[in-house]
């Protein structure tokens, strides 16, 4: 078991912003994602399984929860 196995896997809440660990793109639920036609107000946890980072095509598993400071 790796020390980093659960890194970034804390439970998220609906308004959590998520950051891509590859290109640092931030998914903000308040803004949605115009590239994937995701409407504002859509939590990261409600994105479809095929959604990927609009900048680098990374999987959702590569995203980490940002801290509470906005």
From Swiss-Prot:
Family annotation (InterPro entries): Rubredoxin-like_dom (IPR024934), Rubredoxin_dom (IPR024935), Rubredoxin_ET (IPR050526), Rubredoxin_Fe_BS (IPR018527)
The Rubredoxin-like domain, residue ranges: 15-66
Residue ranges that the Swiss-Prot or TrEMBL entry lists as coiled coil: none
Keyword terms: Electron transport, Iron, Metal-binding, Transport
Cofactor(s) in the UniProt record: Fe(3+)
GO biological process, one term: alkane catabolic process
Residues at which Fe cation binds: 20, 23, 53, 56
Molecular function per GO: electron transfer activity; iron ion binding
Note describing how the cofactor binds: Binds 1 Fe(3+) ion per subunit.
Pfam families: Rubredoxin
Entry function: Could be an electron transport intermediate in hydrogen oxidation.
UniProt record similarity statement: Belongs to the rubredoxin family.
PANTHER family: RUBREDOXIN (PTHR47627), RUBREDOXIN-1-RELATED (PTHR47627:SF1)
Name of the protein in its database record: Probable rubredoxin HupI
Gene that this sequence comes from: hupI
């Amino acid at each position: 078991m790796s020390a980093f196995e659960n890194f970034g896997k804390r439970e998220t809440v609906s308004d959590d912003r998520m950051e891509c660990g590859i290109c640092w793109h931030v998914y903000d639920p308040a803004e949605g994602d115009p590239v994937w036609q995701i409407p504002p107000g859509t939590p990261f946890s409600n994105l479809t399984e095929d959604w990927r980072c609009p900048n680098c095509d990374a999987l959702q598993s590569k995203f980490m929860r940002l801290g509470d400071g906005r």
